[in-house]
Amino acid sequence: MSKKSENQPCMVCGEISYSIRFGAVSCRACAEFFRRKIVSKARIPKRCNGACDLGKYHRKTCQSCRFQKCLKIGMLEKVVASRTPVNRRSENNQTILSGLEKAYDKLENSRDNVFDRKNKIPKYCNHQELDDMFEIDIKLISTHFIQFFESKSSLENNQNKVLSTHFIIRFSLLEVAFRAFGKPTYILPNNDIIDVSKLDKVYQHLETGEDERGKNSQVILQRFWQMNEKTMKTEVFPVNLDQSEFLFLCALIYWDFGIENQSEKCLEECQRMRTQVLKELTEYEKSNYPENELRVAQVIGILQALQKTLDVIQHSGYISNVYNLKGKQCPLYEATNE
């Protein structure tokens, strides 16, 4: 995979490197990133203007820019292909991560089509648009992403339903946070945005603008948005997940335990799959972080922050119904009560 070079900075992130890997001077982490992307053949989503800063402390911020820089400095796809044995390639395709990447790619493609994201100009999202968008997106998630988990299940349909119902809202909250890494606003699955500092955009009337009920809704619910924002900024954003880590967390969320109405067989299957996911996550972090045990703990710690966010959503949903506030019919509120 590599040959020795003089002590030079990695041409992707600037980390000190002693090797030429896949045709260019690069550190071990960037070379492994490049290899994984070539082997998996998964689409790399682009959520930026193509000019992200990729210093050694920020190289995981944007996969798209990192991959393009790998190509720009001369890293060769054909070298990866020529050095990947047939049996190794087959083994990689059978990992949970590779299956998750393909399923998530299908979900993103379906969103491109349904929401016309390639031609859409992002805008602030009103509460009614937010409700409509999540109602559509939940169906897309069920069809294109949850299908992967169910394909690995030996459970009866009612137990698959228990897991998928538990998964939907947690996945949606985690994904919105993941899309917001390094950005000042929350980016929704249809590419519209929510800015916590401009909640009037959320609660205003879709056609006429401001109205009294919208103002009341904003005043009452603002603290819930702020509580959620604090959790994100202090516990989630600093971890700076990459897409693979995000997908591993998705798997841990789906194969959870202690869920209401979960059968003994379902619990055993979830524990078995979680063990496999954690094994893959640990191996993944070993190739990226010298202190990989700490990184694994940081990634898994996001699940606790996610539970805090879920609690905030449940409370705001209850308040919205009691006071008949705008947004009370949001599908995410309904999902927290199932």
UniProtKB/Swiss-Prot annotation:
It is found in: Nucleus. One of its GO terms (biological process) is regulation of transcription by RNA polymerase II. Residues 7-82 bind DNA. SMART domains: HOLI, ZnF_C4. It comes from the Eukaryota. One of its GO terms (molecular function) is zinc ion binding. This is Nuclear hormone receptor family member nhr-108. The gene is nhr-108.
